[in-house]
Amino acid sequence: MKKSGILNSEVASVVAGMGHMDWLSIGDAGMPVPMGTKKIDLCVDKELPTFMQILENVLKEMKIQKIYLADEIKDQNPEQLENIKQALPDVEIEFMPHTDLKKNLAKTHAFIRTGEMTPYSNIILESGVTF
């Protein structure tokens, strides 16, 4: 049995397989996932697990060079935006319309669905390189 880090086998496998500039997405319970995009559904109940719980655990094992967020998070969920900025203080942020963020999920290696119930709690992580 694995002793530490990400214990969910699907999430651990996706993170371990990420290369430089690959994309991984994490989102709220309501985010539609395009056909063909691997969906890892961790949602157990409302707010279980939360978006930030999953993001923080993924960040322990994945180098991030850039993130993509919906423009709408600035006005509709500024508290979550601040949480994201605190978790990724030195990472470039690119904002785009929510409709474009949804379309870009098709380019991600996987979408991790959380139990998050706050609007626009969705992110695309662009993998960095550790050397």
Curated annotation (Swiss-Prot):
Recorded metabolic or biological pathway in which this protein acts: Carbohydrate metabolism; D-ribose degradation; D-ribose 5-phosphate from beta-D-ribopyranose: step 1/2
Sorted UniProt keywords: Carbohydrate metabolism, Cytoplasm, Isomerase
Residue positions of the active site: 20 (proton donor)
Signal peptide boundaries: none
Record keyword Cytoplasm present: yes
InterPro entries for this protein: D-ribose_pyranase (IPR023064), RbsD-like_sf (IPR023750), RbsD_FucU (IPR007721)
A GO CC annotation given for this chain: cytosol
Any GO BP: D-ribose catabolic process
Keyword Transmembrane: no
Compartments (UniProt record): Cytoplasm
Highest taxon, organism lineage: Bacteria
Catalytic activity: beta-D-ribopyranose = beta-D-ribofuranose
Major localization class: cytoplasm
HAMAP family per record: D_rib_pyranase
Family label: Belongs to the RbsD / FucU family. RbsD subfamily.
Name used for this protein in its record: D-ribose pyranase
Organism: Limosilactobacillus fermentum (strain NBRC 3956 / LMG 18251) (Lactobacillus fermentum)
